[in-house]
């Protein structure tokens, strides 16, 4: 689990509307590699909730996913 300081850094680095391209995602594969999306928000455990171009809203895990 991320420390509070790490979560705050992620929130500062990825504000709402930040564009992101996915390279790989662990676990669920509803978002294919190469997909683009924008940040909706970062939650209190540091997951980046997205609005993906394919309509998915699956969150990114900064410790496991590559983007």
Feature names for model-found ranges:
Residues 1-67:
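Basic/aromatic-rich interaction segments and small domains that mediate binding to polyanionic partners
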């Amino acid at each position: 689990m991320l420390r509070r300081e790490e979560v705050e850094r992620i929130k500062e680095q990825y504000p709402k509307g930040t564009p992101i391209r996915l390279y790989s995602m662990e676990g669920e594969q509803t978002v294919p590699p190469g997909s683009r999306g924008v940040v909706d928000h970062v939650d209190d455990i540091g997951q980046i909730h997205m609005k993906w171009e394919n309509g998915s809203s699956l969150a990114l895990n900064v410790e496991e996913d590559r983007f």
